[in-house]
Amino acid sequence: MRVGSAVSPKVLKGFRDLLPDEEIERALLVEKLTVALRQMGFVPIDTPALEYTEVLLRKSEGDTEKQMFRFVDKGGRDVALRFDLTVPLARFVATHYARLYFPFKRYHFAKVWRGEKPQMGRYREFTQCDFDIVGSDSVCADFEILKSIRHMLYMAGAEHIRIHVAHRGLFDRFLRALSLSDQAEHILRIIDKRAKMAPHVLTAQLESLCDPVRVQKIMTYVSAGEVDGVAPSFEHTLSAIETLTGGVSEESTRLRKIYELLCAVNIQSSYVFDPSITRGFDYYTGMVCETFLTQLPHIGSVCSGGRYDHLTALYMKDAVSGVGASIGLDRLYAAFQQLGMSREHVCFVQALIFCQDSALMDVYQKLCSYFAVQVATEVFPDPRKLSQQYAFAEKKGIRWGIFVEQRNAVVEDCLLVLRDLSTRKDTRLPAHEVRRRMAAEG
C-alpha cells in the first residue's frame, strides 16, 4: 500500500475494542458467574451468531425488527445476527429435542447485536449471559431462576441488589378487564420504558391508545402500593394488585407461592413485587423480573427475564415451557467500574526472565519450563535494552525479574538474580530457591 493511502483505523459507533486489562477483568467476571451457574446445575450450550431472519422474527416484531442487523447473504438467504439468546434457545430445543433431557438447565455466554442508540454500558454489540430452565412449568422453576440471579450476582461481588418481580398474566388480565386486549402489546412496551420517560410523556403515549379514565387506571396499577415513590412489602403490593384485578387469581397465587419459597430460604429481602415490570419482548407469558443495583439505580436493569410458555411452539408441534433470565455483561461490568469494584491491573504472569544474550535462549526456556510448574513465567524474546524490558514488565504488572548470572547443566542449580521489580531489590539464589521463594510469596 502506498504511503498516505492507509485506511483510518476507526471503529463503528456502538462497537468497541477491549484492551487486555479490561478483557481480563471481564473474563474473571465470566468465571465467577460460570462457577455459580455450575453450582446450580446449569450446563453450557452455543448457537450460531447468524440465523435465518424468519427464525428470529417468528415471535418478535416492531422495535425488534427495526433494531436487527439484517441482510441478504451471497446465497440469496434473508439472514440476521441474533438480537438475544432466548429465541435461538427455542430454535435449539426444537432442533435437538430428542437428544436433550428435561428439565433442561442451560447457560450461554455469547455476543448479540442490536441497532439501538449507544449509551453508557450499552452497545450495539454486547455480551449476554443467559440461563434457562426448559421443560418445566412449575413454580419451583420460576423460584430457581430468581434465586439463581441473586446467587450469581452475589458471587460476582454485587451484594446490594433489588430484584423486581411481576407477572405478565396479571397485567393481561387487568387489560382484558379494561377492554384493552387489542392494545396490550403497545401498552406493555410503553410501560416497559416507563423509567426513561417523564410522567407527562408516559401519560400522553398511553392516551394515544385509550381514554384518560383508563389511562389513570393503568397508572394506578403500575404504581400499586407505592408510598411517596417507595415500594412496600411484596405481600402488600400483591394484595393491592389483587384488589385492582378482582381478587385472588391463578397468577397472583403463583406469585405468592414463589414468594413463600423465597421466604423459606430466607432471601426474600432481595425481592419486591413491582407491577410496572412488563418486559418489552412479547414472548413472555408469566413471571417477569428485572434486577437493579441499589447503589446505581440509574444504570438500569443488569439482569432481566421471565417465563415463556409457548415460545418453542413456533418451531415444533408441542410447546415446551421455559423460564430464564439474562445478565448484560457489559452493563454489569460498567457498573462495577463505577463502584470501584474492578481492579486497575490484573496480570497472570508473575515472573519475567530477562533476555541478556540470545545465545542463552535455551537456558532461558529451560528455566521458564522449570518455574512454570509453580509460577507463571515468560521469557523476553530478544536482547533489547534492559530499560525496554523493564518497561514491558512494568506495563504488564509483572512482579519478579530473573537474570541468569551463571548457567549450569542442571537447570535447578543455575545461579540467578531474583529482582523484586516493585522495590528493585536483588537476591542471588540458585534456581530451585528462586522457584520456592516466588511460589511462597506469590
From Swiss-Prot:
> Whom does it interact with, and what assembly results?
Homodimer.
What subcellular compartments does it reside in? Cytoplasm
Q: Does Transport appear among the keywords?
A: no
Biological process terms from the Gene Ontology for this record are:
histidyl-tRNA aminoacylation
Q: Which InterPro entries match?
A: aa-tRNA-synth_II, aa-tRNA-synth_II/BPL/LPL, His-tRNA-ligase, HisRS-like_core, HisRS/HisZ
**Highest taxon listed in the record's lineage:** Bacteria
**What does the record give as the reaction this protein catalyses?**
tRNA(His) + L-histidine + ATP = L-histidyl-tRNA(His) + AMP + diphosphate + H(+)
The UniProt keywords, alphabetically, are: Aminoacyl-tRNA synthetase, ATP-binding, Cytoplasm, Ligase, Nucleotide-binding, Protein biosynthesis
Tell me the SUPFAM superfamilies matching this sequence: Class II aaRS and biotin synthetases
> GO cellular component annotations, sorted alphabetically?
cytoplasm
Has the keyword Ligase been applied to this entry? yes
Which protein, by its recorded name, is this?
Histidine--tRNA ligase
As given in the record, the signal peptide range reads none
Stored CDD domains:
HisRS-like_core
Of which family is this protein a member? Belongs to the class-II aminoacyl-tRNA synthetase family.
**Species in which this protein is naturally found:** Treponema pallidum (strain Nichols)
PROSITE patterns in the record, alphabetically? Answer: AA_TRNA_LIGASE_II
List the Pfam families hit by this protein, alphabetically. Answer: tRNA-synt_His
- E.C. no: 6.1.1.21
Please list the disulfide bridges.
none
A single Gene Ontology MF term assigned here is: histidine-tRNA ligase activity
